[in-house]
Amino acid sequence: MQKLVKIVLVFLVITSACKSVKKVQIIETQIFKKDTAQTVVISEAPKVDSAKIVKDIMTKLVKRKIDFTSFNAKINVDYETAENTQKMTAYVSLKKDSALFVKIAVSPYGVVENIYVNKDSVILIRTKGEKSIQYSAISYLQETTNIPFDFSTLQDILVGNPIFLDSNIVSYKSNSTQLLVYLVGNLFKNLVTLDNTDYKVMHSKLDDVDENRNRTCDITLSNYLPVNGNQFATYRTISVSEKSKLDISLDFKQYDFNNPLQYRFAIPTNYKPKKPVEKKPVAKKTASKK
């Protein structure tokens, strides 16, 4: 179950890896297949003030960012791999810039694990079977997944805020209904689809920059509903593949902002401490002496 919990946390934050580059042009070929990612044709757009267009895009994205003090949600989570399919319910309470409480429930057992996250640490509490508690620095998840993220990015993704605002736009293409924005960072190439009316994030496709890896991620946000004057994506799907494929869906059944935290829990003091599984260093081969 701890592996499942890490998977859910990881793919809530996977889109935070994009960094900045400096050139702005018009997309002529969209990157929808990994094997075409290196053959994108980009043509210059004469007589177009690209800097002004990009500034306008970023300004509108900032304006639609949800401002909040607290967030509660009940989320139906489905995940599927080649070997396993699992359904669970996540009960989430978030205090902005401070603390995240997550209760993981699996039928018919009820709550089987609690997760507490703050800016510095992650605590996993197993509440069924062999009860245990595991303390880790937040860097532990970064190290085990090779994906950099922080608490601020995690909370933005949970409430549905765009999380690539610190990146420069490389390319863009606009039509009557959609705006395609292309970013390239240190880890991923990211093609983001926005609604051209109110700049809701509809889709994000990430491909690994490293040609030696085959890591891809597709994220879709849909079923937007008005909440406190904001648009909130109540359904999200995530498909990730590298050596194997993982599909996750997040269906927000209940959600509210700026109310008291509903799913807080105390950190037990009598549970058996469990150490995180450390990565074993790869032994270097030494040349045999003749």
Labelled PLM ranges:
Residues D35-T36, S50, S98, S121, ...:
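Coil residues (strongly favoring Ser/Thr
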Residues I57, K128-K189, I267-T269:
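Flexible, processing/modification-adjacent segments and terminal tails
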Residues Q2-V10:
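Sec-dependent signal peptide recognition
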Residues S20-E28, V170-K279:
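Gly/Pro-enriched, hydrophobic low-complexity segments
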Residues I14-A17:
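C-terminal motif of bacterial Sec signal peptides marking the signal peptidase cleavage site
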Residues K23, A99-S152:
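An acidic-aromatic
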Residues K63-F71, A82-Q86, S93-S98, T197, ...:
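Edge/loop elements at the starts and ends of beta-strands within beta-rich repeat scaffolds
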Residues K19-N76, E80-T85, K275-K290:
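N-terminal leader/targeting segments and the immediate start of mature chains
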